[in-house]
Every structure is written in C-alpha cells, then in structure tokens.
C-alpha cells in the first residue's frame, strides 16, 4: 500500500495529463518545453514519458495552461494539507486567487493596511507615482487561517479573558481579520521577466507585512535547472521552489548525462532551495 502523499502526487500528475496541460504535440514538443532549446526539449520529453504523457494535436495557450496549473496546484495543496490536521490543527482555507484581485491579501491581518494605502494612492496621483506598484501583491494561491474563539482557547484551561492578551493575533475576540499563512506563486514555465517576478513579489510581502511573515513559495513545472535557478538561488525573497516532478527531473538529468545541469540541480536541492511538490504540504505545517 502506497502512502497517501504518493497517491496525492499521482492524482496531481493525472489531472495535469487528463486536462492536456502536460501533453506532447504532434511535433514531439511537450507543453512545458521551450521547443527552440534542445535541453529543454529533451528534459521535458523525458519527464513527460515517465509520467506517460499522451500526444495531442496542439498545446493549450500559455495563459490557459498557467491558470489550469494554478487550479490543480490549489487542489493538491487543499487535499494534502487537510490530512495534516493532527500535526497542524486549525481552521484553514486554500484559495486560488490568480490576478483577479490585486488587493486580495488586504483581506488578511498582516496586510490589512494596504487597503488604506491603495485608497490614499487613488486620491493622490503624486503619492501613487511615489509608491509605484510595490504594495500590490497578487499570489496565485493563498493558505489562510481563521482565528480562534476564546471558548476554544480556554477549552482545557482558563487562559484568557477580556483583560489579558488583548492584542494577540490569533484571537478572534480581538476583532482581528484572518491570518495569511502562505502565499504560493505558480509558474508553469520560467521564461520571461514576468515569470521571475515571484522574487520581487516575495520581497514586497516581506517589506509590507505587519506581524508574522507568511510562507512564500513558488511551484513550477519548468524543466531546465538553469531557469529554475533564476528563482531558486539566493535567500530572503522566497522560502523555497517546489518542482512538480523533482524525482523525475533528477532521473532524466542523470540518463541524459547533463552533468552541469545535474550539478546545478544538486546545488539547489542540497542547499534547500528546490524540493518536490510532495514536500510542500509538510513544509506548510511548520
């Protein structure tokens, strides 16, 4: 019998395959490959073969693939993370945000002040010009935690009343908003400046928060280690990059004998900058 997280990982891959998000076109190019780059072509094909990708007449448009990848990542996080209630109990929510609401995170406690900032910028063009877009942060997926009522806090012992711990972030009785636990950026591929904006958004999350910093992570299906490293290497902006098929990526790099790419792969893995998608739920439980 396989562990549940192995099953969740297989379901995640099956959804990508069944939806033709990960697919091979009739020219042999896999949907997450750069067809003009030989290494990208070969690595992506190797991973797709291991995951049993089928041939389709044409790949999905880039934006469609990206949105679908976000949705499937969100479903994976939701399903896997809820199995960790015994490790990380709480009233959790996982939500796909996308680019629909540039102030979605202002609904949560650490970033509630951004609403007032946005309003002030709206009313003052000079302030808007000075601020730029540094305060607008649009995660693809968020994990949030609802606050705890005093009755639950006091369930085993009488810990708090209206005169103590009156500013505690986790306490519902203090009139606080829910907490942002994690910001997840999904990048189907990493081939443009826009794809690499995950680092700048991560830095904005660090700079603009009041209170506890949420987890800041990136999930990608990019096949080439060199492009993954453009986001993964370095520290400060993001916790870690999670690859949709890390084990398969390692296997293909070994079989293709891409030694320099494999060296970079191990630098990222051993440096705790790159992990598998199956590691994400447990890391979110920290």
Swiss-Prot record:
InterPro entries: NgoMIV, NgoMIV_sf, Restrct_endonuc-II-like. It comes from Neisseria gonorrhoeae. Mg(2+) 2 binds at residue 140. One of its GO terms (biological process) is DNA restriction-modification system. It catalyses: Endonucleolytic cleavage of DNA to give specific double-stranded fragments with terminal 5'-phosphates. The keyword Endoplasmic reticulum does not apply. Its EC number is 3.1.21.4. Disulfide bonds: none annotated. Gene3D superfamilies: Type-2 restriction enzyme NgoMIV. Its cofactor is Mg(2+). GO terms for molecular function: metal ion binding; type II site-specific deoxyribonuclease activity. Keywords: Endonuclease, Hydrolase, Magnesium, Metal-binding, Nuclease, Restriction system. This is Type II restriction enzyme NgoMIV. Mg(2+) 1 binds at residues 140, 186. Homotetramer. The keyword Metal-binding applies. Binds 2 magnesium ions per subunit. It holds the Pfam family NgoMIV_restric.
């Amino acid at each position: 019998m396989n562990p549940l997280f192995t099953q969740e990982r297989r379901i995640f891959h099956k959804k990508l395959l069944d939806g033709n998000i990960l697919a091979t076109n009739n020219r042999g190019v896999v949907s997450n490959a750069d067809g003009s780059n030989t290494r990208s072509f070969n690595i992506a094909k190797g991973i797709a073969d291991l995951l049993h990708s089928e041939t389709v007449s044409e790949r999905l448009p880039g934006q469609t693939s990206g949105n679908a990848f976000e949705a499937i990542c969100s479903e994976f996080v939701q399903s896997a993370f809820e199995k960790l209630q015994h490790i990380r109990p709480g009233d959790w929510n996982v939500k796909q945000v996308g680019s629909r609401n540039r102030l979605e995170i202002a609904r949560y406690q650490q970033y509630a002040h951004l609403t007032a900032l946005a309003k002030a910028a709206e009313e003052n063009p000079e302030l808007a010009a000075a601020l730029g877009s540094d305060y607008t942060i649009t995660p693809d997926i968020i994990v949030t935690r609802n606050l705890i009522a005093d009755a639950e806090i006091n369930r085993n012992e009488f810990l708090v009343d209206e005169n103590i711990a009156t500013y505690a972030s986790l306490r519902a009785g203090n009139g606080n908003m829910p907490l942002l636990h994690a910001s997840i950026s999904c990048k189907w591929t990493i081939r443009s400046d826009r794809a690499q904006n995950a680092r700048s958004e991560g830095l904005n999350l660090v700079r603009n928060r009041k209170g506890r910093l949420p987890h800041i992570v990136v999930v990608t299906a990019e096949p080439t280690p060199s492009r993954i490293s453009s986001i993964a290497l370095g520290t400060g902006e993001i916790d870690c990059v999670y690859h949709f098929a890390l084990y398969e990526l390692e296997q293909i790099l070994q079989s293709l004998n891409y030694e320099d790419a494999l060296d970079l792969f191990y630098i990222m893995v051993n440096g705790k900058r790159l992990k598998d998608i199956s590691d994400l739920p447990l890391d979110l439980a920290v």
